[in-house]
A protein has these predicted regions:
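Nucleic-acid endonuclease domains
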Residues: 1-34, 38-170
Length: 170
C-alpha cells in the first residue's frame, strides 16, 4: 500500500509544480473513497500501474470479499482520473480521463463489464477495472495522454543510512 501512496505523492508533486501549491489541495483524508487530490477544486483519482499492458488497475484496495462486493454494487465514477503507466525501459503513459468519459464508458459497458471482482478464494488485493473498460477509457477521444519513455537509472541509495547517522549523533 505504501508503494501506491509514494507513487501518488510523486504525481501530486508534479501537479503542485505545474499549477502551484495554492491550486492543489493535498489534505484529503485517506479514507475518502476515490479522491486522492483536488486541483483547482476538482477532485482527482490517481491510479498507477507498472508493466507493458493496461491491466490490474485497482478501483479499490481490499482483501475483504464482502467489502469488494458492496463496492461493486455501489460504485459509479465520481471524479476525474490520472492514470500513470510505468513501463521501465520502454514506453508507458500519463493519461487524463475526465469524469464524463468514465461515466459514458461505465454506462455503455455496464457494471459487469466495467468492474472485475476478485475471484473467490484468491488474494488479489482489490477490485479492478476490466481490460475492456481501461481500453475504452484511454482510447476515448476526450481522454488525453502523454507517452513517456521510462528509463530506469541506477541510484545508490540506502534508506537506513540517514537514520543510522542521525542516531549516531546522539
Amino acid at each position: 500500500m505504501e508503494v501506491g501512496s509514494i507513487r501518488e505523492k510523486i504525481i501530486v508533486a508534479l501537479l503542485i509544480y505545474r499549477f502551484g501549491e495554492a491550486n492543489v489541495e493535498t489534505e484529503i483524508p485517506i479514507t475518502e473513497p476515490e479522491v486522492d487530490v483536488k486541483s483547482f477544486g476538482h477532485p482527482i483519482s490517481i491510479k498507477t500501474i507498472t508493466g507493458k499492458g493496461l491491466a490490474g488497475v485497482k478501483l479499490i484496495w481490499t482483501v475483504d470479499a464482502q467489502k469488494a462486493k458492496e463496492f461493486c454494487e455501489n460504485y459509479y465514477p465520481k471524479c476525474d482520473m490520472l492514470l500513470v503507466q510505468v513501463n521501465w525501459n520502454d514506453t508507458g503513459g500519463f493519461y487524463y480521463i475526465p469524469l464524463n468519459v468514465q461515466k459514458r464508458v461505465f454506462d455503455k459497458l455496464s457494471r459487469k463489464n466495467y468492474i472485475r471482482l476478485p475471484r473467490p478464494g484468491t488474494n488479489p488485493r482489490g477490485v479492478e477495472f476490466t481490460k475492456e473498460a481501461l481500453s475504452n477509457l484511454v482510447g476515448d477521444s476526450e481522454s488525453r495522454n502523454i507517452l513517456i519513455n521510462w528509463q530506469r537509472t541506477k541510484i545508490e541509495f540506502n534508506p537506513y543510512k540517514r537514520w543510522v547517522d542521525l542516531w549516531r549523533k546522539d
